[in-house]
């Protein structure tokens, strides 16, 4: 018992959590000399590697001086905040990682508030101190002020600080120390993180905090043993959070070490293990001793704030590019996702339509991108926020938005956000000519803002937001100003007609792209929709003027990635997603029917 420490690593996106865990893994001797370690070895999913973000919390364990340290790497994005909250219940200590230049960011606040309310005393790791613009002292003061604002106790305010550069693999307790290795960090963990409370002699109590799925054994629950001990094939009782019970046997017990998962025979109080044997397992359920059942408090999960409709693709080009195109295939895949992804919900709406709700655009686009890579073909509607009724008042989710931008652009941003019903809370100058702006804004006002924001700040601004609370509905929010350019013919687009259309706005397609009636091929420069013919070719005549024929110059089209396309579309449009293409189209394809529907 005394030789176990359970810690979580929390930080803002891109402050180096996963890189730090890499360093801890390789320096604790968990990998043998021969093994080659990947970079950011904890981000196991392709999308995580590409975007450099962590989506699911991962766990691993290392040994240092006979002590087993269980480390859980948590996501930094607010969209995955539901994950973080559950992880905090499982650990006794937290490494709070802060970038030595950027300081405390809004999403860190969200997690820190939760950690402090659980009574955890964090260890503050100031990372990336090798940056030229690093100001570690200012950052430590910022953390202190944040803790005070969050109502931390005196004990929590007396936090240990470690300075590190995870990428170069060294840490030190004060800035004048020698830059050797991560040993100071290991020592701090052993010294300041309490060993798990609980006793091996009590009746068994364990709680599941995240789920995994295996094609052979079915659902796997990853759980912490709070009291007692458990062995393989033992009969136990599963107590669900709604009060129902199920008897069963533990068919597999799996322990973690480094990146490997190994089957084990026993687990004791303080361990974090994976178990199989129940199909009805859910997050927050307790596994207890059948002779003396004492369940643990179920966990509270945050409500989804946003929903989209996934539907079968019914466009004229449907079924040509995807492997899985039927409603049943889509339904099975979405339900399988819901088994392990706890912060999302899925309802069947009939006619091959499914309503999927989650914590934000990022979470939903990542699901869509995963489906697309698996060969699915489907359509998605525009994201909508979830409206709740509290005491007869319509309420919508509000977000806390923090923007770092060069000073020259702050005026334009404040004006834009004002139209989207944002309320400015603070404006502070930072070093290097940047300004930090803080707003409270309805989640609806944020849909579609990111692409405008990047244009307004010429790509130099950084924006982050996290969920605040539900508040009374704030009226209508300005949406996209420009209309769409819509194809009125079926066929292949020609360079000749695109050359004539491009004066009317920005195109989304290249010549030779297949188009159909009702497909959106560009953004109109005015606010109305315009039907155009992109497949006309040049008429041939006998007259020839030398050199005038080949003078077609096309502006390169605007490429639409999934997030941008979802933000761009309006109520009457849907996004068609196939493994090869993203196409935006009107819900009603026929132009005459569309005009009638508008009246």
UniProtKB/Swiss-Prot annotation:
Its EC number is 3.6.5.-. GTP binds at residues 14-19, 127-130. SUPFAM superfamilies: EF-G C-terminal domain-like, P-loop containing nucleoside triphosphate hydrolases, Translation proteins. Pfam families: BipA_C, EFG_C, GTP_EFTU, GTP_EFTU_D2. It is an enzyme of class 3 (hydrolase). GO terms for biological process: ribosomal large subunit assembly. Its main location: cytoplasm. Signal peptide: none annotated. It catalyses: GTP + H2O = GDP + phosphate + H(+). Monomer. Belongs to the TRAFAC class translation factor GTPase superfamily. Classic translation factor GTPase family. BipA subfamily. This is Large ribosomal subunit assembly factor BipA. It comes from Helicobacter pylori (strain J99 / ATCC 700824) (Campylobacter pylori J99). The gene is bipA.
């Amino acid at each position: 018992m005394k030789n176990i420490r359970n810690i979580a690593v929390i930080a803002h996106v891109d402050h180096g959590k996963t890189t730090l865990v890499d360093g801890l893994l390789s320096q604790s001797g968990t990998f043998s000399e021969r093994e080659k370690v990947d970079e950011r070895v904890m981000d196991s999913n392709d999308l995580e590697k590409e975007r450099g973000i962590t989506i699911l919390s991962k766990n691993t364990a290392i040994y240092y001086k006979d002590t087993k340290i269980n480390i859980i790497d948590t996501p930094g994005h607010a969209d995955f905040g539901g994950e973080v909250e559950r992880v905090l219940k499982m650990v006794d200590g937290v490494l709070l990682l802060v970038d030595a230049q950027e300081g405390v960011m809004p999403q860190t606040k969200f997690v820190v508030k939760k950690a402090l309310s659980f009574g955890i005393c964090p260890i503050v790791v100031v990372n990336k101190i090798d940056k030229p613009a690093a100001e570690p002292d200012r950052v430590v003061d910022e953390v202190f002020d944040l803790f005070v604002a969050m109502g931390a106790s005196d004990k929590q305010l007396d936090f240990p600080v470690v300075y590190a550069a995870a990428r170069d693999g060294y840490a030190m307790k004060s800035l004048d120390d020698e830059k050797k290795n991560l040993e100071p960090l290991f020592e701090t963990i052993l010294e300041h993180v309490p060993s798990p409370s609980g006793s091996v002699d009590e009746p068994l109590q364990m709680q599941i905090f995240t789920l995994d799925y295996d094609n052979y054994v079915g659902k796997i629950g990853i759980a912490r043993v709070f009291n007692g001990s458990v062995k393989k094939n033992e009969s136990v009782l599963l107590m669900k959070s709604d009060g129902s019970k199920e008897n069963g046997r533990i068919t597999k017990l799996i322990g973690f070490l480094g990146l490997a998962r190994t089957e084990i025979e026993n687990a004791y109080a303080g361990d974090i293990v994976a178990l199989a044997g129940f199909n009805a397992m859910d997050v927050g359920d307790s596994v207890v001793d059948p002779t003396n059942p004492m369940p643990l408090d179920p966990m509270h999960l945050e409500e989804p704030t946003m929903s989209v409709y996934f539907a079968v693709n019914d466009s004229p080009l449907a079924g040509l590019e995807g492997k899985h195109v039927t409603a049943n295939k889509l339904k099975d895949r979405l339900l399988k996702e819901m088994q392990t992804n706890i912060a999302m919900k899925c309802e069947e709406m009939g006619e091959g339509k499914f309503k999927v709700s989650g914590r934000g655009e990022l979470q939903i686009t990542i699901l869509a991108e995963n489906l697309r890579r698996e060969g699915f073909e489907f359509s998605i509607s525009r994201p909508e926020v979830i409206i709740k009724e509290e005491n007869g008042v319509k309420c919508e989710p509000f977000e806390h938005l923090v923007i770092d931008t060069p000073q020259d652009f702050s005026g334009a941003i404040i004006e834009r956000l004002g139209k989207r019903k944002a309320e400015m809370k603070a404006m502070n100058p930072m070093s290097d000519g940047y300004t930090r702006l803080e707003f409270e804004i309805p989640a609806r006002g944020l849909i579609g803002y990111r692409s405008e924001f990047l244009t307004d700040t010429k790509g130099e601004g950084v924006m982050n937001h996290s969920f605040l609370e539900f508040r009374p509905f704030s009226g209508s929010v300005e949406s996209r100003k420009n209309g769409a350019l819509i194809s009125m013919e079926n066929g292949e687009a020609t360079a000749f007609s695109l050359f004539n259309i491009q004066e009317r706005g920005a195109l989304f397609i290249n010549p030779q792209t297949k188009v159909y009636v009702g497909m959106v091929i560009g953004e109109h420069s005015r606010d109305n929709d315009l039907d155009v013919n992109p497949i006309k070719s040049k008429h041939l005549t006998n007259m020839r003027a030398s050199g005038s024929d080949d003078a077609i110059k096309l502006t390169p089209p605007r490429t639409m990635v999934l997030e941008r396309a979802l933000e761009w579309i309006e109520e009457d449009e849907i996004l068609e997603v196939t493994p090869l293409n993203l196409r935006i189209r009107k819900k009603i394809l026929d132009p005459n029917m569309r005009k009638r529907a508008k009246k």
